[in-house]
Amino acid sequence: MDLRQFLMCLSLCTAFALSKPTEKKDRVHHEPQLSDKVHNDAQSFDYDHDAFLGAEEAKTFDQLTPEESKERLGKIVSKIDDDKDGFVTVDELKDWIKFAQKRWIYEDVERQWKGHDLNEDGLVSWEEYKNATYGYVLDDPDPDDGFNYKQMMVRDERRFKMADKDGDLIATKEEFTAFLHPEEYDYMKDIVVQETMEDIDKNADGFIDLEEYIGDMYSHDGNTDEPEWVKTEREQFVEFRDKNRDGKMDKEETKDWILPSDYDHAEAEARHLVYESDQNKDGKLTKEEIVDKYDLFVGSQATDFGEALVRHDEF
C-alpha cells in the first residue's frame, strides 16, 4: 500500500472512530468567504486586502513599506492582465480574486502532480494515476482492510474521463485539477451529483428519499431522541429539497441542494475595486490606477489605517 492509500485509509478510519451520532455531514458546496472581516471601507480596507490577495498573503503586505507594497502590487497587476492589453477588466479581476481565494486547491494539485506524473512529461495519463494510486493494493489486496479498491478505481476512472475534455485519457494540469476538485468546474458538476447520489441512494433506485437523506447525515444511536437539527433537516427536505413533492429527490433536485447558486462575491468585489479605482471612468483599470490606490488593494505598514504589525490575534 503506497503512502496515499495509507493516508486515505487512516483518515477514513480516524473519521469513523471519532464520529458521533449527532454530528452532521455537510455535502453542500459553497463558495468560500472572501474574508471574515467586515466590509466597511470607511473603517478599514482589511476585507478588500483579504479578497484581493487571500488572507495569508494579505498578512505579508501589512509588514511592507508603501514603496515595497507598490512594487509587489505592480508585479501582481501584470499577472492579472491576462490578455496583456495594458488594462485590467472586471472579469480579469474577478478571475484573479477567485484564484487568490482558491490558492490552496492549486497547491494541492501541485503536490499530487509530482507523485503522479511518473514520466515527467508534464501530463498525467490515466495509467500513471492508476498505477501510482492503486497499483500495489490491486496486485496484493488485503482482504481485511474493508475497502473495495476495484470499485473505487472504477469510480475514479469515470471521473478522470469526465475531466479529460479531449478524451485521450491524458490529463493536462487543468484537467487534473478538475479531476481532483470537480466541484470547482461547471462541466464536472454532473459527476459530483452522480457520486453524491450513489453514496446516499442505498436502495439504488436512482433517487434519494427522506430516510436516505437523513441517514447520510445522522446515525441514530439506540433510544436517544433525534437532535433538533435532524428535525429541521426533515422539514427542509419536505419543504424545499423535494420540489415536486414526490417524496424523493431526483438528479436536478440533488444538484440544487449540493451545488446551490450562490451570490458571486468575487464579481461583486471586482466591481467594487474597479469603481473605487477607475479615475477616468472607462470601466477598466490601468496599472497606474491600481498602484495609485495600493492602500485599497494590498495595504502596507503605512496605510490610511496604519497597521504596522500583523495582528496575530485576529487569525
From Swiss-Prot:
It holds the Pfam family EF-hand_8. The modification N6-acetyllysine is found at K165. The keyword Nucleotide-binding does not apply. Ca(2+) 2 binds at D117, N119, D121, E128. One of its GO terms (molecular function) is calcium ion binding. Ca(2+) 5 binds at D242, N244, D246, K248, E253. Ca(2+) 1 binds at D81, D83, D85, E92. The modification Phosphothreonine is found at T65, T254. A motif (Prevents secretion from ER) lies at residues 312-315. Ca(2+) 3 binds at D164, D166, D168, E175. The modification Phosphotyrosine is found at Y47. Residues 1-19 form the signal peptide. Glycans are attached at N131. Ca(2+) 4 binds at D201, N203, D205, E212. Residues 68-103, 104-139, 151-186, 188-223, 229-264, 265-300 form the EF-hand domain. PROSITE patterns: EF_HAND_1, EF_HAND_2. It is found in: Endoplasmic reticulum membrane; Golgi apparatus; Secreted; Melanosome. Ca(2+) 6 binds at D278, N280, D282, K284, E289. Belongs to the CREC family. Interacts with GGCX. Involved in regulation of vitamin K-dependent carboxylation of multiple N-terminal glutamate residues. Seems to inhibit gamma-carboxylase GGCX. Binds 7 calcium ions with a low affinity. This is Calumenin.
